[in-house]
Regions:
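Transmembrane-helix signature of polytopic, membrane-embedded enzymes
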Residues: 89, 185-208, 227, 460-467
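Transmembrane-helix motifs of polytopic, lipid-linked glycan transferases
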Residues: 172-193, 231, 447-450
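Membrane-interface anchor segments at the N-terminal boundary of transmembrane helices
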Residues: 50-66, 168-169, 173-174, 388-470
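Start-transfer (signal-anchor) and selected internal transmembrane alpha helices
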Residues: 1-104, 288-296
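Extracytoplasmic catalytic/substrate-binding loops of multi-pass membrane glycan-assembly enzymes
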Residues: 109-123, 129-157, 161-165, 320, ...
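Membrane-proximal stem/loop segments at transmembrane-domain junctions that anchor or position
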Residues: 308-413
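Short acidic/glycine- and proline-prone juxtamembrane loop motifs at membrane-interface regions
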Residues: 211-225
Length: 473
């Protein structure tokens, strides 16, 4: 058989303390989010349903506790009868339901992209006609965010295939990407743990998670990038657990494409590189460090190639863009929505710098230094700022899944049911459902991280497996 047990290098006392402290910190954070979420919720200003102005409202703790208990009972029953459940049937049903919900959501809403997705979509539409003028019309945006070159050309390719203004086909493709991403998570979990109870719980958690389904109408790199990065991790895991070297090529390719479509997934590449480096050191197979380097180099090279390709075809100078620390600085700023949220800082920074990346870097460092000095001068303000930043995001349990659909127009009027789900009584029911689901996740994360921390602190080094098997040639 190709599959082998994946083990980890021996953990020293320092390793166990460091990893245990990290797990303990995560447990504390999610326990706080759970406690906060039972009492309060972050919501968007009801006077401006399409806006992103965050308010903090008190919840009915009894209702939230009842919902949490209901979710726990549901999963307890599922795990109690899990031996009667055929995993293959459950997996197929979960993936089928996810795809069907995504397709239905896209077909009913027929949403038209706006804001960042709209800029990229309509610019791509003009490129299909050989007209690069939209690039110049959005010069500040694109020269601030040159990493959008990958998704821009992806959107152009799809419009060449499906036709200009093909919102629905791209949404349907998003539904397929989401379904495939769920499939990757299921496969990763099974290959990592081979535990039936865990697999049943994960499958139920995925099929009951409706927030990503609502994002199928959001024509951006989120869902395609998520799918590709998860399958890249799956291919990497197949190699690490004794698979042939042929799995390395799709792992690097898929990870590179994921980062091209959505640069945020460089986090996945960094995590994969770290795991591979630990594997190489623990197994004393230093050749695996080449794979580690590839996991970092391939996405960066692919992103660079995407930018060069767009510049070569259109003559539009993307440049280096805003420095990466721009988004760090933005996250330190007050704004009209909530502390640390998007506030056009990146665009105004590049305008101040007259689109010169070197000048932008200097200005950005000054802005960061100024905010750090303000935080240092008033620690209470700094604590309040980051607390509001955290709860405004993590206690808003729809994760903007409904908001992104409220702000988009449609090719046709919404049916009454959709209007209800987006802003009426159905919206309140759906929001309550999402809140109960998310609180259950926070409880699981807090308990899981806490138990892991205790195990790490209590165990001895020899209690951990010491050497992974080498991959097959």
């Amino acid at each position: 058989m190709e599959q082998r047990e994946l083990t980890a290098p021996c953990l020293t006392r320092f390793d166990r303390v460091a990893f245990g402290a990290a797990a303990g910190l995560l447990a504390i954070v999610f326990a706080y989010l759970l406690a906060y979420g039972l009492l309060r919720t972050s919501v968007f200003d009801p006077a401006d349903p399409a806006g992103e102005h965050v308010f903090y409202v008190w919840d009915n703790a009894a209702v939230n506790l009842a919902m949490l208990l209901g979710w726990l009972v549901l999963f307890r029953l599922a795990l109690h009868f899990q031996r009667r459940i055929r995993l293959g049937w459950l997996t197929g049903a979960a993936l089928g339901v996810t795809f069907a919900l995504g397709v239905a959501w896209v077909l009913v809403l027929r949403a038209v992209p706006v804001n960042d997705p709209g800029i990229l979509y309509y610019t791509a539409a003009e490129l299909t006609r050989g007209d690069p003028s939209e690039l110049w019309r959005h010069e500040v945006y694109l020269r601030t965010n040159p990493f959008q070159a990958g998704y821009l050309q992806y959107s152009e390719l799809l419009q060449r295939i499906f036709g200009r203004h093909s919102y629905v086909p791209q949404g349907l493709l998003n539904a397929a990407f989401l379904t495939a991403a769920y499939g990757a998570l299921m496969d990763l979990t099974w290959r990592s743990l081979h535990d039936r109870r865990t697999q049943v719980a994960l499958t139920l958690l995925l099929v009951l998670c409706v927030q990503p389904v609502c994002y199928t109408t959001f024509l951006y790199g989120n869902l395609p990038g998520l799918c590709l990065s998860l399958w890249a991790l799956d291919c990497l895991l197949r190699w690490l657990t004794g698979g042939r070297r042929r799995w390395i090529v799709p792992a690097l390719t898929l990870m590179a494409l994921a980062v091209v479509l959505k640069p945020n997934y460089l986090i996945f590449a960094l995590a994969a590189a770290l795991v591979t480096a630990l594997y190489a050191l623990g197994s004393r197979r230093l050749g695996a460090l080449l794979v580690c380097a590839g996991l970092l180099a391939a996405p960066m090279a692919a992103d660079r190639l995407a930018r060069l390709a767009l510049e070569k075809r259109t003559g539009f100078p993307l440049g280096a863009g805003a420095p990466q620390t721009t988004w760090l600085a933005m996250g330190m700023q007050e704004g009209p929505l909530a502390p640390g949220w998007y506030n056009r800082y990146s665009l105004t920074l590049m305008e101040r710098a007259e689109l010169d990346p070197d000048t932008a870097f200097v200005l950005n460092r000054q802005d960061i230094a100024q905010r750090l000095s303000e935080f240092a001068a008033d620690p209470a303000y700094a604590l309040s700022f980051y607390h509001q930043k955290m709860v405004s995001q993590w206690a808003e349990t729809t994760f903007e899944a409904l908001l992104v659909n409220r702000v988009m127009p449609s090719e046709s009027p919404f049916p009454a049911l959709v209007n209800s789900l987006l802003s009426g009584g159905g919206s309140r029911a759906l929001t309550l459902y999402m809140e109960g689901y998310t609180l259950t996740l926070y409880l699981g994360f807090a308990a899981g991280a806490g138990l892991l921390a205790l195990r790490l602190f209590r165990c001895k080094a020899q209690a951990w497996p010491c050497r992974p098997p080498p991959p097959a040639a």
